[in-house]
Amino acid sequence: MENFSRKLIDWYRENGRDLPWRRTKNPYLIWISEIILQQTRVVQGYDYYQRFVARFPDVFALAAADEDEVMKYWQGLRYYSRARNLHAAARRMAEAGGFPVTYTGVRALKGVGEYTAAAICSFAYGMPYAVVDGNVYRVLSRWLGIDTPIDSAEGKKLFVRVADELLDRERPGLYNQAIMDFGALQCTPVAPDCLFCPLNDSCVARLKGIAGSLPVKQHKNKVTNRYFNYIYVRMGAYTFIHKRSGNDIWKNLYEPPLIETDREWTEEELYASPQFREMLAGGEEPIVRLVRKGVKHVLSHRVIYANFYEVILPENSASFAKYQRISVEDLHKFAVSRLVNQFFSLILEPNN
């Protein structure tokens, strides 16, 4: 077991990624990086991290910010509940006087699970908590030949126990960073570099030729299709947006008027629909233009098929009164989803 951790740490010192959150013991900065990387690859999250901590350098700066601004800095990272949870947790910490210094306190933060708490506490405070993420599942299942499904209750308990047994308690932060980078760079999901792996002489998966089938998952996520019809209103120098609410995707992000349907609609169906007529509210008949049809946007459990429309109305029109009227020049100030941002780019930068 000691040989396992030593080989991983030796490999990491030679091959590990040089990342800004690895060069600090500041729990706040580590927390921000871990939340960003929960559902985002390092190469995508790096610039977001730099911008986010430049604007919100500590708990108190983040707590004092308006939620709309926090969401704007998160725009493009997806999984926006992470940003809302960050903001809520920062406000609780600011009230309490700063970042918690115990595992229990860190684990109690909104949006922080066992993995994230273990990462923060081992990296910032040197506490002996083993991380268990996708990379760790992959490395351990292959090295030990474990075929217990990682998404089963039995599998989760097993991997937590094994990870804890293998943890280097003298250097928990270094070991955790090593095994995560090893999974990300060496023991990859597809085409792992087994030939030059420092563990290849003891890896069960390599010896049995089963690396490609591990780790095992028993359930596949059910994917649902949704159909969006977005309407960009051009009313002189103004347009209309609203903030999404409820527990649906993209909560608290802004978007143009939307009609969601149970299948893809034609232009004629949209134009004649009660929803569109209600938006017009008896105002003038607009000019309607289909900007783009059938744009596919893939989320973790959903596939959205979107049609983008432009509606042109005179500046004194009474239509779309229930929406927030804003200057087109101010549109960039509002946090929107990637899909909506793509729509706005087509409208406002048609030649790009």
Which residues fall in each region the model found?
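Intrinsically disordered, low-complexity, charged terminal extensions of DNA damage-control enzymes
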Residues: 1-17, 23, 184-352
